[in-house]
Amino acid sequence: SIGHIRPYLTNEATKTLVNSLVTSRLDYCNAMLTGVPNTLVNKLQRTQNTAACIITRTSRYSHNTPVLKELHWLPLKYRIQYKTLTFTYKALHDQTTDYIRDMIKVYKPNRALRSQDSLSLVVPNVRTVSFGERSFVHAAPSLWNALPHHIRSSETLSTFKKLLKTHFFLVCYSHII
């Protein structure tokens, strides 16, 4: 366990170890966790919280939000949304495979409306909340349409990622001074 060898590691070595062993596992295919019940996401969040406490040498019983903010880490719920929205951006800009691109439909009204330039996506109707709303086909447009327009209209992927992470960071940590 990293916690047992932590006294012998520098801060940089600990960050590298945690990033390679813990964070990489949390981020691997986490877009598949879209719509998973909060009880399951919270279990994974506890793993991220423990890793953050090991890096910063804080008590595991202390409040985790300031620790995550100090490390510039998004909570797992927002990391999942970040990955889903990144796939969505890539699909809209022809930077991903055809089968993902085919899942996303751009909203085009039949007549002239103010919303025609909003870069919105069509959210398909679903029959079941448990499976339908969890699917990428439904979740991606819902998350995309909730973003501010200046983020959706980003010119490059790197700009989009930067603005999206800043947006999520403000949403998560704006209540902390």
Regions found by a protein language model. Name each.
Residues 1-177:
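Hydrophobic/basic alpha-helical segments
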